[in-house]
Structures are given as structure tokens and as C-alpha cells.
Regions:
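N-terminal Rossmann-fold cofactor-binding loop
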Residues: 30-35, 51-52
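Glycine/proline-rich active-site loop of Rossmann-fold NAD(P)-dependent oxidoreductases
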Residues: 115, 165-170, 196-205
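N-terminal Rossmann NAD(P)H-binding glycine-rich loop of SDR-like oxidoreductase domains
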Residues: 3-23
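NAD(P)-cofactor binding segment of oxidoreductase domains
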Residues: 75-102, 137, 141
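Alpha-helical membrane-targeting segments
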Residues: 111, 115-135, 178
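Substrate-positioning beta->alpha
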Residues: 82, 86-87, 138, 156, ...
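Conserved beta-loop-beta element that borders a ligand/cofactor-binding pocket
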Residues: 143-164
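Conserved Rossmann-fold cofactor-binding substructure of NAD(P)-dependent oxidoreductases
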Residues: 43-66
């Protein structure tokens, strides 16, 4: 499958590029600085230098793709619009190019559905008002923009991401969080994302995932 990956130089994006290439996909990685890309260009990996915030600049990367995957997200906990701005730009480029399949990474902090009382009524509200206030608001607006689009989207909602090796063992839930599950390895998250590329049952759904 021909896939385009945004956020390819981040921790999750790096893993996504590596697994996508290793499993035989034809990958276009969109980066601002090619020197930061861990996987070198090759027969299955094309590198395009562009700013994800510029729909016209990323259009060549999206055109002809079977699917787009985004691991773009903010760094740090300060004020940010990275998630929402990149989502709107990607949506515009995809709509102009006629590409419909989008899988993107958000976070479990955005939703309380499926959580137990302690998490829903105490811990998450505190986190959303304090430590992750800006990040959560940004993710929520990105999700709203994606949900309002005409794309065949899937939004991944992982809890805390770790750098542990893939286990191949993870749980998922549709449109609700997994209670009592607090981590997922990036490697397992990426494995799941790639498995959903042509899964119609995951379209227009929020997928929780945890180890």
C-alpha cells in the first residue's frame, strides 16, 4: 500500500516509518529536516521536505497515496496549536488530492468514556486543568476538525507512550477508553495503526489501545 507519514522524525513517527517499510509498504515520509530521519531513503521510502502546516507544500506527498498516517503532536506542555493546525492542513491537502483514508494519533486524555469513577471524576479533570491543559485542548480541537471532515478517519487514543519493544499483545476498544490501562509501547501502537489501514470497521471511530 502507498502511505504518507507525517511526524516521521518524532519517536512514534520514526517507529511508524520503520515498521511500514519493513512490512512492504511504499512510504512517503514528510519531514522538515531530512537529516533527522532515522531510516534512509530507499526503494520503499521516499523523503519529501515540507512544512506540514502548508497544505500546498504537502499536496505532492499526499497525491496518489492510499492512506495518510499522522504522528504529529506537540512537544512539551505549553500553549500549542500543533495538533489542530496540522490536522486542518492535512485534511485540506487530502481533500484536494482525493485521498480519503486517514489514521492519526491523539490521546486517551481527551475522553472519559469507559473510565472508572476515580479517573473520570478526579484524576483526568485535574490533569486536563493543569499539566496537560494546553495539549488536551489542542488534541480535542484536532479531533473535532477530523470528525467534521468527509475523510475515512480513525483516531488512535493511546495512554502514555513508552519506548519498550513490541510485544504483539495489546488490547483495543472502540469509542471508549480502556479502564486501568495506562501505557502502550510505540511499537505496538504503530503495529495496530498499520493493521487498520484497510479495516473499514475502524473508520469514523476512536480506537483506544493499551498493553
Amino acid at each position: 500500500m502507498k502511505i504518507t507519514i507525517f511526524g516521521a522524525t518524532g519517536a512514534t513517527g520514526t517507529c511508524l516509518v520503520e515498521q511500514a517499510v519493513a512490512t512492504g509498504h511504499q512510504v512517503t515520509a514528510v519531514v522538515r529536516n531530512p537529516a533527522r530521519l532515522a531510516t534512509p531513503a530507499g526503494p520503499r521510502l521516499r523523503i519529501l521536505t515540507a512544512d506540514v502546516m502548508d497544505p500546498a507544500a504537502i499536496s505532492p506527498a499526499v497525491t496518489g497515496a492510499d492512506a495518510v498516517l499522522s504522528a504529529v503532536g506537540p512537544r512539551g506542555s505549553g500553549p500549542t496549536t500543533v495538533s489542530q493546525d496540522s490536522a486542518r492542513s492535512i485534511i485540506e491537502a487530502m481533500q484536494e488530492s482525493g485521498v480519503r483514508r486517514l489514521i492519526t494519533v491523539s490521546g486517551s486524555v481527551v475522553s472519559d468514556i469507559g473510565e472508572g469513577p476515580l479517573m473520570s471524576y478526579l484524576l483526568k479533570p485535574i490533569v486536563r486543568r493543569t499539566l496537560l491543559r494546553h495539549v488536551c485542548a489542542d488534541m480535542r480541537r484536532a479531533e473535532e476538525a477530523i470528525g467534521a471532515s468527509n475523510l475515512d478517519w480513525t483516531i488512535m487514543r493511546p495512554p502514555r507512550l513508552t519506548g519498550k519493544a513490541a510485544t504483539g499483545t495489546y488490547r483495543t476498544a472502540i469509542d471508549r477508553n480502556l479502564p486501568g490501562e495506562y501505557t502502550i509501547s510505540r511499537a505496538d501502537l504503530v503495529t495496530c495503526m498499520l493493521s487498520l489501514l484497510d479495516d473499514e470497521s475502524s473508520m469514523h471511530r476512536h480506537i483506544a489501545i493499551a498493553n
